[in-house]
């Protein structure tokens, strides 16, 4: 639970927090606590993963591209980043959406100009309405909600209870639906229930739009992330902790995903990744809601100090992974007691 974790962290019961802390800057600017993040200014952390809203493609009407795209382009992502993430994420104006995280290495792996017309930054209410109107998905009975083949479009958007940033993001998704005539309500099951449902196909009723994670940084990225988001090998399976929880299938995407590991030519690899981004932004089986760090790395220096931070002089730099993962463990050798 984020709130309980934040309370313990503020009290000095936790030295390094990997939880999302809303308005983290208030801990030092307003509360005067000896707290800091890896980066001193927004977004305070290094973006590495792409928390994603998945469409249940087995749900009524969500097999229609116009419905999926309308919802995705109508969402106010700036509000998600400002409110749900309290600016601890780059915006989609700063880092246009693709399948890549914001790091320079991944951003260099696709042709930005080639997909520019497919990228969207959100809050395009009029564009979303036109998409639906052009597809004949309109409100014919005057109740305020659009219908597809005579049935109102009603969806439940969901995230785990207590995951406050995800819940806030899902509320923004639901609000977008209302603005374009699609009835989206929200529900927040406990994680113990949530994780058993979303990992087993077919999805239960009430999981039409749902949040899950994507891969962060690593030696197999972005290939592994893309595979987990798009590969049909995971579609419509049970006990699925890999990805593609919405049941998306595209043979062209599968072919590219299978071919990439054997590619050695940089130009060929870039072309393949660019084509995958095109497919993803054209079909919209899911959509990224924010950029998120591999780990939130916020430290309380009440007891220990000299934690890793940007420009700390370590060579190679110790990454902000909470002193627990890979080279981040090296940071343990640098911390010292505030009062020895």
Located regions from the model:
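Extracellular/periplasmic catalytic domains that process cell-envelope and extracellular macromolecules
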Residues: 45-48, 64, 148-151, 201-205, ...
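Short helix-loop capping/hinge motifs at secondary-structure junctions, enriched
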Residues: 59-67, 138
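Extracellular/periplasmic solute-recognition and catalytic clefts
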Residues: 1-59, 70, 78, 82-85
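Loop/turn elements at helix/coil->beta-strand transitions in domains of secreted/extracellular proteins
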Residues: 13-15, 35, 64-68, 76-78, ...
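Ligand/substrate-recognition segments at binding pockets and active sites
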Residues: 2-5, 11, 18, 119-121, ...
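Extracytoplasmic/secreted cell-surface and envelope-processing proteins
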Residues: 6-7, 26-28, 53, 63-64, ...
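Detector for C-terminal structural segments
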Residues: 72-112, 165-175, 199-340
């Amino acid at each position: 639970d984020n709130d309980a974790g934040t309370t313990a962290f503020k009290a000095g019961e936790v030295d390094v927090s990997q939880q999302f802390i809303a308005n983290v800057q208030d801990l030092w600017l307003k509360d005067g606590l000896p707290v800091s993040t890896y980066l001193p200014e927004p977004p305070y952390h290094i973006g590495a993963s792409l928390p994603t809203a998945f469409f249940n493609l087995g749900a009524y009407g969500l097999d229609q591209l116009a419905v999926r795209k309308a919802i995705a382009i109508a969402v106010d992502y700036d509000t998600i980043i400002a409110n749900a993430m309290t600016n601890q994420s780059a915006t989609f104006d700063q880092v246009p959406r693709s399948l890549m995280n914001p790091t320079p290495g991944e951003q260099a792996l696709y042709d930005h100009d080639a997909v520019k017309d497919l990228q969207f930054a959100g809050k395009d209410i009029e564009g979303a309405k036109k998409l639906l109107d052009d597809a004949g998905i309109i409100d014919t009975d005057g109740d305020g909600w659009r219908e597809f083949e005579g049935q109102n479009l009603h969806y439940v958007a969901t995230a785990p209870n207590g995951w406050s940033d995800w819940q806030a993001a899902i509320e923004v998704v639901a609000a977008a639906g209302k603005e374009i005539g699609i009835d989206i309500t929200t529900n927040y099951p406990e994680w113990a229930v949530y994780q058993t449902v979303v990992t087993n196909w077919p999805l239960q009723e009430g999981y039409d739009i749902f949040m899950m994670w994507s891969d962060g940084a690593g030696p197999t990225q972005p290939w592994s992330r893309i595979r987990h988001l798009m590969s049909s090998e995971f579609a419509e399976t049970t006990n699925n902790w890999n990805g593609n929880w919405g049941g998306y299938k595209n043979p062209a995407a599968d072919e590219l995903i299978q071919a990439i590991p054997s590619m050695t030519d940089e130009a060929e690899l870039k072309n393949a990744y660019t084509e995958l981004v095109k497919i993803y932004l054209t079909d919209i089986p899911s959509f990224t809601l924010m950029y998120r760090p591999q780990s939130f790395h916020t430290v309380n220096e009440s007891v220990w100090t000299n934690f890793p931070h940007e420009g700390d002089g370590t060579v190679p730099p110790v990454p902000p992974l909470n002193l627990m993962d890979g080279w981040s463990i090296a940071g343990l050798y640098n911390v010292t007691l505030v009062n020895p």
